[in-house]
A protein has these predicted regions:
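Classical nucleotidyltransferase
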Residues: 1-29
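A short, N-terminal "cap"/entry segment at the start of jelly-roll beta-barrel domains
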Residues: 18-57, 86-91, 128-137
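Acidic-residue sensor for enzyme active/binding pockets
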Residues: 46, 65, 117
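A generic "binding-loop/recognition-motif" signal
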Residues: 53, 62-63, 101-102, 111, ...
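Short beta-strand His + acidic residue motifs that chelate non-heme Fe in jelly-roll/DSBH
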Residues: 56-57, 76-77, 97, 103-110, ...
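Glycine- and acidic-residue-biased ligand/ion/polar-headgroup-sensing regions
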Residues: 62-81
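Short acidic-glycine-tyrosine-enriched beta hairpin
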Residues: 80-102
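Double-stranded beta-helix
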Residues: 104-137
Length: 137
């Protein structure tokens, strides 16, 4: 026998499935990201940096990025060589990364770091291809 209205309405009972369908995870060695929204001149992403992991040192020609830490802790390494600065982010902190600025996000704790990242730039150029990486020690 099939029973209706058990466990909430249909949208509530399958919301986890809809969330995974609308914004699947892209797995990386440092954790994962999800594309959440693309608007005119901006893109919103969720980044999760796993414990004791770092993204690559990178910069972008066509976009700036605003990183908003929503849980956990993270270090943002900005610049290279003698101009390198390390910013520690805790809950609700944010950092603006300008176009062309070298940066690398790291999580040196035992809990995941959750970041909401906002890209700003020309909509057509807001892609994962807009990246230059270098190896750092």
């Amino acid at each position: 026998k099939f029973v209706f209205n058990v466990g909430g309405d249909k949208t509530e009972s399958s919301s986890w499935l809809l969330d995974k369908w609308k914004s699947p995870k892209t797995i990386r060695k440092w954790g994962y990201y999800k594309d959440l929204y693309l608007g005119e001149g901006f893109k919103v992403k969720e980044l999760v940096i796993e414990p004791f992991s770092c993204l690559s040192m990178q910069r972008h020609e066509h976009r700036s990025e605003l990183w908003n830490l929503v849980s956990g802790s993270a270090e943002i390494h900005m610049g290279i060589g003698e101009e390198k600065m390390i910013y520690e982010l805790n809950n609700n902190a944010s950092v603006l990364i300008e176009k062309g600025e070298w940066h690398m996000g790291c999580n040196m704790t035992d809990k995941p770091a959750h970041i909401v990242e906002i890209w700003r730039g020309n909509t057509e150029e807001l892609t994962e291809k807009d990246i230059e990486r270098i190896q750092v020690d």
